[in-house]
């Protein structure tokens, strides 16, 4: 995947992204509603096995700094059905980067991959739910 927006590039992860990804996954506050923060070795293992090996996620790169500031889970779970999720570097929260890059991935799913459904699950506070609504997602299920 390679998508460019005004301020972001969404692309596949590379091994060189380990330090930037660790700034995200190694931060206690960022990870508080997911799982315990990763040490650097666990970040590298996750990057290699899941992000690169299984192509289970894409990198959200800040154009101006060329820094990976976000991790976007993007998996096909059934024909035409994609799961997505996101975690962003805390230094870049509340500046519209998550919306801009996630919107681009959703648009890509519907226009290029002929998706008929893209969904996300929220386990944290209202931050993710608010973004989901802004992205046009609707509450479904319990």
Regions found by a protein language model. Name each.
Residues 40-44, 52-53, 89-91, 121:
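Juxtamembrane/interface motifs at transmembrane-helix termini
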Residues 29-49:
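Conserved GNAT-fold acetyl-CoA-binding loop/helix
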């Amino acid at each position: 995947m390679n998508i460019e927006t005004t301020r972001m590039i969404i692309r596949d992860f590379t091994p060189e992204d380990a330090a930037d990804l660790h700034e995200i996954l190694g931060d206690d506050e960022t990870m508080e509603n997911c799982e315990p923060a990763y040490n650097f070795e666990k970040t590298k293992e996750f990057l290699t096995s899941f992000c690169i090996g299984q192509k289970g996620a894409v990198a959200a790169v800040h154009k101006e700094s060329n820094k990976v500031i976000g991790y976007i889970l993007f998996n096909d779970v059934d024909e035409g059905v994609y799961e997505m999720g996101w975690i962003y570097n805390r230094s870049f929260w509340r500046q519209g980067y998550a919306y801009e890059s996630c919107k681009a991935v959703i648009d890509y799913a519907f226009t290029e991959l002929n998706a008929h459904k893209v969904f996300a699950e929220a386990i944290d506070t209202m931050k993710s739910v608010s973004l989901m609504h802004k992205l046009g997602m609707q509450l479904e299920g319990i």
